[in-house]
A protein has these predicted regions:
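A short core secondary-structure module
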Residues: 168-214
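N-terminal glycine-rich flavin-associated loop
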Residues: 92-114, 140-141
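C-terminal helix-coil-helix/basic helical segment that borders enzyme active sites and/or dimer interfaces
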Residues: 30-40, 287-295, 311-345, 354-366
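Glycine-rich beta->alpha junctions and the first turn(s) of the following alpha-helix
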Residues: 3-10, 14, 215-315, 425
Length: 426
């Protein structure tokens, strides 16, 4: 794989269009949501922005060309995600969570399933939502745990030509939809055979919004991403056709691994976006503010060095994430390991860099009149979601290194160990 991150004409156009849309449209999200008291109200208030995003074709730009969308690869998705997330993390996360919700369908679905479930997401109208329903109350870092560990507790039982699904899920982005009755499509991780080990007993099933049985329980009032919804809900004997099984029965852990692989690299980009927004503000502040002195504070070496360190980290995190995206796009050796590194590095760097930039600005950065406090609140989530860095991501890296066949140069020219990395995690 050539080491070349030069953007082609289409990618430069995508970046330009996404940046303009974020500036013109997504910049209005904070004003529309900040004074609303509940997470549900704030989330619902983002719907017009999301509808505009869909209407202008940006959701299509996140869905692979191979299934009818306009996305040529994860690098393109990373470019789009950075431009959106830099301006507003809320609607951006709703869009990208929908993409994750579709991932098991895109990766493991049959052509007939693509034709049944994807049209609403390709139509460039409305406000379609999808959600990957994996996490459960009590945590899901050990979804593949052997007894006596509980692992996945949501069950799907086969009755004739149907699956009947029961269980509880939480922290699933936009899973209960705009009105509490469900997203347009859920891809549900569930136990289809309790009598075999998880690697053969967990599956993923597509669940269109049911007429009954999806019961909203709670909306988390989060520290950051204040206008994004991550509810807890229950599936109470929800019945779907047997043909909604995605991939092979019992192949859910591997399908989840393949679906989640790209999310790691993209969370790294989320970190880049938040750092970029913080850096741009802090740089402008340092060039314009004297803070009672006789010269702009950027003239002070401590301030200049702090800004330089921040920019170095941003560039490093972006290149690592792009490298992971390109490796995943081309199924290059070591792609999964790169994606995990991108997630861990980018997410943790965001918290550290934004905190350091707040020190450049001073105590005023602690108030919400300036953007840095809100950016830090958003950044704190990144090491925790899409596979927590401690409970899941570092454990995946640990599993790679424990394998006798592990090659530390696999990210250059070694053997891809994706199956091993996910054998005991998401």
């Amino acid at each position: 794989m050539p080491i070349d991150f030069t953007l082609n004409d289409n990618q430069r156009r995508l970046r330009r269009e996404a940046r303009q849309f974020a500036k013109d449209v997504l910049s209005g999200v904070p004003v529309a949501t900040r004074d609303l008291p509940s997470p549900i109200e704030r989330f619902v208030a983002t719907r017009p922005f999301y509808e505009r995003l869909v209407a202008e074709g940006f959701l299509r730009k996140c869905i692979p060309v191979s299934v009818g969308g306009d996305c040529a690869g994860l690098v393109d998705l990373a470019i789009l995600a950075e431009e959106f997330y830099t301006v507003d993390a809320n609607v951006s996360l709703t869009m990208l969570s929908t993409v994750l919700g579709l991932a098991p369908l895109v990766v493991g679905g049959k052509p007939e399933q693509h034709q049944r479930f994807l049209p609403p997401f390709l139509a460039a109208k409305g406000a379609p939502l999808a959600a990957f329903a994996s996490t459960e109350p009590g945590g899901s870092a050990n979804v593949g745990s052997l007894p006596p560990g509980e692992g996945v507790r949501t069950t799907a039982r086969r009755f004739g030509d149907s699956w009947v699904i029961s269980g509880r899920k939480q922290w699933i982005s936009a899973a209960t939809g705009w009105n509490g009755q469900g997203a347009d499509l859920l891809t549900v991780v569930c136990r289809t055979d309790a009598n075999v080990e998880p690697s053969r007993g967990i599956s993923i099933i597509a669940v269109p919004r049911p007429d009954s049985g999806l019961i909203f329980e709670h909306a988390f009032d989060m520290l950051g991403h204040r206008a994004h919804l991550t509810p807890r809900f229950r599936l109470d004997a929800v019945q779907v056709p047997a043909g909604n099984l995605l991939g092979q029965e019992g192949g859910g852990l591997q399908l989840a691994a393949e679906s989640f692989a790209g999310s790691g690299a993209l969370v790294g980009i989320f970190g880049v976006a938040l750092m970029r927004a913080a850096f741009q503000f802090a740089l402008s502040f340092a060039k314009s503010e004297k803070r009672g002195g006789i010269q702009q504070i950027i003239q002070h070496q401590a301030v200049g060095y702090a800004l330089a360190d921040a920019k170095t980290t941003i560039e490093a995190a972006r290149v690592l994430s792009w490298h992971a995206c390109r490796a995943l796009d081309t199924a290059a050796p070591g792609a999964l390991e790169l994606a995990i590194h991108a997630k861990v590095f980018g997410s943790e760097a965001a918290v550290r860099v934004i905190t350091n930039l707040m020190q450049v600005v001073g105590v005023d950065s602690y108030g919400h009149e300036l953007p840095l406090a809100g950016l830090l609140q958003d950044a704190v989530a990144l090491p925790l979601f899409a596979g927590g860095n401690i409970g899941v991501r570092r454990r995946q890296l640990h599993a790679l290194m424990l394998d006798p066949a592990y090659d530390d140069l696999a990210t250059l020219d070694g053997v891809c160990l994706a199956e091993t990395a996910f054998s005991n995690g998401e």
